[in-house]
């Protein structure tokens, strides 16, 4: 990927998680590995961002106050279907029936919190290709 000036464009990751500390940690790890990262705690605000910004990967919490990850995904799927394959879900939930059903219907990886750095980087590399 190149910018109009010919230099390589950094891949951009959108992190949607209401856990500010974890989202910041993910962001710092990604920046150390050459990514640009945007953190958004509110999924509704993140939806607006996705409509007008290029994104190479989306890390999304499954359970959030304003809009849960499954509904966020469904909205993105309708508005920007090309991003569906770029999702990575994270969750601290053990087994929630609603989310389990959703997870079984999508082809996005689900990482359990706490997430190993190596696992996070591998999944972001895969999603951002």
Report the location of each language-model feature.
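Acidic catalytic/metal-coordinating carboxylates
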Residues: 41-45, 68-74
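Receiver (REC) domain active-site loop signature in two-component systems and cognate sites
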Residues: 64
């Amino acid at each position: 990927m190149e910018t109009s000036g010919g230099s390589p464009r950094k891949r951009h990751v959108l992190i949607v998680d209401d856990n500010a500390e974890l989202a910041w940690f993910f962001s710092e790890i990604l920046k150390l590995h050459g990514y640009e990262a945007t953190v958004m705690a509110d999924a509704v605000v993140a939806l607006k961002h996705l409509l007008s910004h290029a994104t190479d990967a989306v890390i999304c919490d499954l359970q959030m106050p304003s809009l849960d990850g499954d509904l966020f995904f469904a909205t993105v799927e309708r508005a920007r279907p090309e991003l569906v394959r770029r999702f990575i879900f994270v969750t601290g939930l053990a087994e929630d029936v609603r989310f389990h059903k959703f997870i079984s219907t999508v082809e996005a990886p689900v990482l359990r919190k706490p997430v190993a750095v190596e696992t996070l980087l591998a999944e972001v590399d895969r999603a951002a290709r």
